[in-house]
Amino acid sequence: MNTDPIADYLTRIRNANAANHRVVEIPASNVKKEITKILFDQGYILSYKFEDTTAQGTIKIALKYDKLTKEPVIKKIQRISKPGLRKYAGSTEIPRILNGLGIAVVSTSHGVMTGKQAKANKVGGEVLCYVY
C-alpha cells in the first residue's frame, strides 16, 4: 500500500521524463486528476486521458519535450507537503516559483489550483508541489 499517492504520481512523471518516455500511465484519484488538468493548462504536458477500465481508473499522460533540444519541459517536479509534515500557506504566503516561471500547486477549500489562482481568489491551503 502506498502511503503518499501524490508523491508516487510525481515520481512516476519524474521517472518517465528521465527515461524520455512519451506516455506514462498512473492510477487515478480526484486530486491527481485535478493536478493533471493544471499541468495541461499550464503547458507542462501535451495531453491526458482518464480511463475507467479498472475499479480505480487510470490517467494516461502524454509528456511534453522541447522540439529542438529534446529536453523535458518539466525540469523539476517536487513534493512539498508530505503526510508526515504538512505545509500550509495563507494567500499572501504562497511563494512565486522561479520568479514566476514555475507554478505551485495548492489544495484549497475551493479545490486544487495554482498558487497564482489561489492568490487571486485570496485563499490559502496546503502546498502540494512545485513544478518548473
Swiss-Prot record:
* Entry-linked InterPro entries: Ribosomal_uS8 (IPR000630), Ribosomal_uS8_CS (IPR047863), Ribosomal_uS8_sf (IPR035987)
The alphabetized list of GO BP terms reads: translation
Q: Which domain of life is it from?
A: Bacteria
Q: Name one GO cellular component term.
A: ribonucleoprotein complex
Q: Which UniProt keywords apply?
A: Ribonucleoprotein, Ribosomal protein, RNA-binding, rRNA-binding
Q: What GO MF annotations does this protein's record show? A: rRNA binding; structural constituent of ribosome
Name the family the entry cites. Belongs to the universal ribosomal protein uS8 family.
- Primary role: One of the primary rRNA binding proteins, it binds directly to 16S rRNA central domain where it helps coordinate assembly of the platform of the 30S subunit.
Stored HAMAP family: Ribosomal_uS8_B
What does the record note on quaternary structure? Answer: Part of the 30S ribosomal subunit. Contacts proteins S5 and S12.
Q: What is this protein called?
A: Small ribosomal subunit protein uS8
This chain's source organism reads: Christiangramia forsetii (strain DSM 17595 / CGMCC 1.15422 / KT0803)
What is the organism lineage in this UniProt record? Answer: Bacteria, Pseudomonadati, Bacteroidota, Flavobacteriia, Flavobacteriales
Gene encoding the protein = rpsH
